[in-house]
Amino acid sequence: MIDITLPLTDIHRHLDGNIRAQTILDLGRQFNIALPAQTLETLIPHVQVTSTEPDLVSFLTKLDWGVKVLASLDACRRVAFENIEDAARNGLHYVELRFSPGYMAMAHQLPIAGVVEAVIDGVRDGCNTFGVEARLIGIMSRTFGEAACLQELDALLAHREKITALDLAGDELGFPGSLFLSHFNRARDAGWHITVHAGEAAGPESIWQAIRELGAERIGHGVKAVEDRALMDFLAQQRIGIESCLTSNIQTSTVASLADHPLKTFLEHGVLASLNTDDPAVQGVDIIHEYHVAAPAAGLSREQIRQAQINGLEIAFLSDGEKRALREKVAAA
């Protein structure tokens, strides 16, 4: 189902949601951190979704073991590097990795700006080693409140030239976008792109808010957009992309089944929706699974899957020249 003549992208992929179970074991042993299991086989149920979670917040607890072992900046650098290695193994040509530096720093009180620098270094080294092209998106974890998000923003802005965009993720219902207007004003002033997790746990009004108040150019998940025809029209007309994550939305109980997922409707409506993983290690999936298994199960035709692949590059945070160069590189391979 993947068109090998086109660039393969993953533009909604959490770096801190893609920490290998083996790496969690390794770092746990290195730093004498008590883990819930001592073998890879017995650890996996604690760090990977093995059945549908009742809600988004329950799903997010599966991520916690990955960051609990980040006891040094070198550990952060390692998982960033491994994220690029994983992308290369999946055949990705271009990936946008998003990460919450405050979340990664929290368990061991690491310097947040140091975490940002370590991630930048690890991704750079990975790209140089494996030939994948990548951009970084900084996340503010809304669940921790406005002040904590301000700390994350300051740390990201200290390395603003290496960050491409700002995102807001976490508890969408408890911490609406309206709390973070000044944060996004600063991000836009820095020249960053804006993407926002919206319409995942909350309704279409959250997507409208992300666009109108926060300046979102893309929406993460956005499944509730299907409930508002005017919003669907607006997304299509204004070319505001939807970063769809099929398997993730089932595992978080955001959508009841793949057959009920709105991605097919988005594509039929002309919305620039793409296929992405979200948290690959936690979900136990990769981009190949999303194209070959999840997308057909969601009712997408071969041509719609190809369109989603095209959309992934179309809405990527790259210049027109960078997109053209990537298309030419893949076509010539």
UniProtKB/Swiss-Prot annotation:
Where on this chain does Zn(2+) bind?
Answer: 12, 14, 197, 278
Which catalytic residues are annotated?
Answer: 200 (proton donor)
Q: Which InterPro entries match?
A: A/AMP_deam_AS (IPR006650), A_deaminase (IPR028893), A_deaminase_dom (IPR001365), Ado/ade_deaminase (IPR006330), Metal_Hydrolase (IPR032466)
Q: Where is this site: Important for catalytic activity?
A: 221
In terms of SUPFAM superfamilies, this protein maps to: Metallo-dependent hydrolases
Keywords recorded for this protein, A-Z: Hydrolase, Metal-binding, Nucleotide metabolism, Zinc
Gene Ontology annotations for the cellular component aspect, listed alphabetically? cytosol
Q: Which cofactor does it need?
A: Zn(2+)
Q: What does this protein do?
A: Catalyzes the hydrolytic deamination of adenosine and 2-deoxyadenosine.
What name does the UniProt record give this protein?
Answer: Adenosine deaminase
Q: Which organism is it from?
A: Salmonella heidelberg (strain SL476)
